[in-house]
Amino acid sequence: MTSCHIAEEHIQKVAIFGGTHGNELTGVFLVKHWLENGAEIQRTGLEVKPFITNPRAVKKCTRYIDCDLNRIFDLENLGKKMSEDLPYEVRRAQEINHLFGPKDSEDSYDIIFDLHNTTSNMGCTLILEDSRNNFLIQMFHYIKTSLAPLPCYVYLIEHPSLKYATTRSIAKYPVGIEVGPQPQGVLRADILDQMRKMIKHALDFIHHFNEGKEFPPCAIEVYKIIEKVDYPRDENGEIAAIIHPNLQDQDWKPLHPGDPMFLTLDGKTIPLGGDCTVYPVFVNEAAYYEKKEAFAKTTKLTLNAKSIRCCLH
């Protein structure tokens, strides 16, 4: 018999989150649709729960009410004593943790798909938090293969000092899905179709896995975050240069030392320094102006996964 890495157990509980950011409308629209008619997301033997994560922000069509829901799922915020004085999103995070967690427990949901849009030209993107997770690498390989020839990129946010504390991190297997470009507060049919297909293929993978299909060893190309880059700023902290036209919409493309990065209003080009080629992502993302992030630098690498098969009882 072929030796293989056996994944822990079959997958039982899956959640699909929309509206973690209330103005990213593809996930909101799909989740609302699936709450009314969820036939397309159901798979035999699998509990799939669509869920609106930040209903107040969705109602106002804004990213958040008090603070970013997708950055506060750490033990400090989840452990705060519940009171009306807490920011709305912290209270909501505790409610979500109660419903789908608790985080880092045996009772937490197996998989959470968190649906997002970006204003950046990132196409279909899967966000991975753990480079050693054979199950998710296999799932992402399946999704990428199923979507081809449509490109699907994998963004690895594993980093020693950049801690995200994402909404989906309460699950055993957290999956971020990011599709763009799409303006905030807008629905685009092409973007919706791409996100819908990503979810379909992900659920198909889980179904095949649960039925005992063995997935042979595989490898995927990923883009691992190195650092986030702020806009150049003046002495008052105001933005002093904008994304250069040569960099705009060039997510995932190589940016070499000396290539144009920013452009000042008086026409001066600010190039990339250093001696390493990087791959920019979230270029000129609207939501990241407040976070002082013009783009993120990534490096390209390959992740390998062992063969996996479900432990059938």
From Swiss-Prot:
The cofactor named in the record is: Zn(2+)
| Variant or mutagenesis effect after changing residue 178 to D | Abolishes enzymatic activity
Tissues expressing the protein: Brain white matter, skeletal muscle, kidney, adrenal glands, lung and liver.
Q: Give GO cellular component annotations, separated by semicolons.
A: cytosol; nucleus
Q: What effect on the protein does mutating residue 152 to Y have, as reported in its record?
A: In CAND; <0.5% residual enzyme activity
Single Gene Ontology BP annotation? aspartate metabolic process
The EC number(s) given in the record are: 3.5.1.15
Q: What does this protein do?
A: Catalyzes the deacetylation of N-acetylaspartic acid (NAA) to produce acetate and L-aspartate. NAA occurs in high concentration in brain and its hydrolysis NAA plays a significant part in the maintenance of intact white matter. In other tissues it acts as a scavenger of NAA from body fluids.
Q: What is this protein called?
A: Aspartoacylase
Q: Which organism is it from?
A: Homo sapiens
